[in-house]
């Protein structure tokens, strides 16, 4: 990861009593502190509507570290929160100006007492409909201004908007009070080690990059499959979003950008994001006819009975689509994106299937054509990369067989891989936005996704529910998932 943060700072969590704070943010800060990445002077300040004292938040910190930390010794720590050095809490409804004023007073006090130099990282772990009011109040209180020699940055969780129009409005509202280099739109997939390795694998190895194009690649498949449903936590939100907005608009499209983009001019935030934007700009929005022919949506049996879900809901818990990237490198190559809840197994991967050789030389000894070569990038679990190819079987009889060459992170490296939120928080503290999305990225992703949602709104809804839990999704999706049907001829 990056080097140690040198400058003092205060990390302010909005929604500090919530699930994301307990499961991800607090354990991430603990690990950064225990591994020596944080400076001597820093503080963690939480705020939410829940009434509690500083000491009560410290108890929650200890509990969160013991329950959610993946460090072997986290639970054995006599006082895990001591690694965070200073933890404070300010209760209040930050959609109200008076609560933000009280928070400002508390942060100014911490600045003065601890010498934090006005450096602040705000993390908005709150419901999307609260974001604009909170930002408005922070601006009115002067808390977004950067004094000379100090910095203020704001991290925004997904979803960033609900469609193209709302994303544009939110971006415009933020640009009125923040500079783009203060805005950190988080997608936790970009913090995963296996995702960051994609660019290294592509542009650090001369044997692979020359064949990543329409001449050699037959199709690309990206799958984000989950075995869980709502689990009683997200029903109300999810029922207004669905699989397409929740996963494809961000995680799946970000993976597509990394696997399909051109080499950046340099390995800095703007150069990388410039190339990702070019990929998104090459995704042509779909017409209603194309949506009908090239997408499938599903809903698992039992979804309508989940807490917070409309009993007559037509929200999709599964989405699959086929598209193309209309640029010189990829034109005509089928791109298949798939995501779903309550699937047979949990995994995220990218599969690249290559074209067949021009002539099958082994037709006398084996089935022709043989299975095509393929490259699988495993994002989770068992992070790694596999290359499948054809090999001659040992023996006097000439026969061929598919084999795999495999790289696994756990088998190749002894050191612990940082959790996604550890990496992302550390990069935000350093002011490096390479792993965060830019405003034009967000809007171009929504441009493509909104065309599909608009198409669905004009088509009759499918007969939901249309797939059983612990399956591969609706039967109709087989036309995308069967390689012989999606393969470019």
Show where each model-derived region lies.
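Secretory/organelle targeting and membrane-embedding segments
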Residues: 1-156, 160-489
């Amino acid at each position: 990861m990056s080097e140690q943060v040198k400058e003092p700072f205060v990390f302010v969590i909005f929604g500090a009593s919530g699930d994301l704070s307990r499961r991800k943010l607090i354990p991430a800060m603990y690990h950064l502190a225990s591994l020596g990445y944080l400076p001597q002077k820093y503080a963690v300040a939480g705020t939410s509507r829940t009434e509690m004292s500083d000491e009560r938040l410290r108890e929650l910190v200890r509990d969160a570290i013991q329950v959610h930390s993946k460090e072997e010794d986290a639970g054995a720590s006599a006082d895990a929160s001591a690694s965070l050095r200073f933890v404070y809490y300010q209760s209040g409804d930050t959609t109200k100006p008076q609560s933000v004023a009280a928070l400002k007073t508390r942060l100014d006090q911490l600045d003065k007492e601890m010498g934090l130099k006005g450096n602040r990282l705000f993390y908005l772990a709150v419901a999307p409909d609260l974001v604009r009011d909170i930002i408005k109040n922070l601006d009115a209180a002067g808390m977004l201004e950067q004094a000379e020699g100090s910095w203020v940055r704001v991290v925004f969780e997904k979803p960033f908007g609900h469609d193209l129009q709302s994303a544009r409005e939110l971006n415009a509202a933020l640009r009125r009070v923040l500079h783009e280099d203060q805005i950190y739109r988080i997608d936790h997939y970009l913090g995963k080690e296996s995702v960051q390795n994609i660019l290294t694998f592509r542009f650090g190895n001369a044997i692979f990059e020359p064949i990543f194009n329409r001449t050699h690649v037959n199709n690309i498949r990206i799958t984000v499959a989950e075995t869980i449903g709502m689990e009683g936590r997200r029903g109300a939100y999810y029922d207004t979003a669905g699989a397409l907005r929740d996963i494809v608009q961000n995680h799946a499209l970000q993976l597509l950008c990394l696997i399909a983009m051109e080499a950046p001019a340099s390995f800095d935030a703007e150069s990388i994001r410039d190339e990702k934007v070019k990929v998104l700009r090459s995704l042509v929005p779909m017409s209603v006819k194309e949506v009908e022919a090239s997408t499938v949506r599903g809903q698992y049996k039992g979804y309508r009975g989940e807490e917070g879900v409309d009993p007559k809901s037509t929200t999709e818990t599964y989405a699959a689509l086929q598209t193309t990237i209309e640029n010189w490198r990829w034109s005509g190559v089928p791109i298949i994106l798939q995501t779903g809840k309550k699937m047979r197994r949990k995994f995220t991967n990218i599969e690249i299937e290559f074209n067949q050789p021009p002539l099958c030389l082994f037709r006398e000894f084996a089935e022709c054509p043989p299975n095509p070569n393929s490259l699988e990038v495993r994002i989770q679990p068992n992070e790694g990369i596999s290359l499948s190819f054809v090999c001659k079987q040992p023996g006097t009889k000439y026969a061929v067989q598919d084999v795999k060459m495999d790289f696994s992170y756990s088998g190749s490296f002894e050191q612990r891989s940082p959790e996604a939120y550890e990496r992302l928080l550390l990069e935000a503290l350093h002011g490096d936005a390479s792993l965060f999305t830019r405003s034009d990225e967000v809007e171009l992703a929504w441009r493509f996704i909104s065309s599909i949602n608009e198409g669905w709104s004009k088509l009759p809804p499918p007969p939901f529910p249309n797939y059983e839990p612990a399956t591969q999704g609706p039967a109709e999706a087989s036309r995308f998932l069967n390689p012989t049907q999606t393969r470019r001829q």
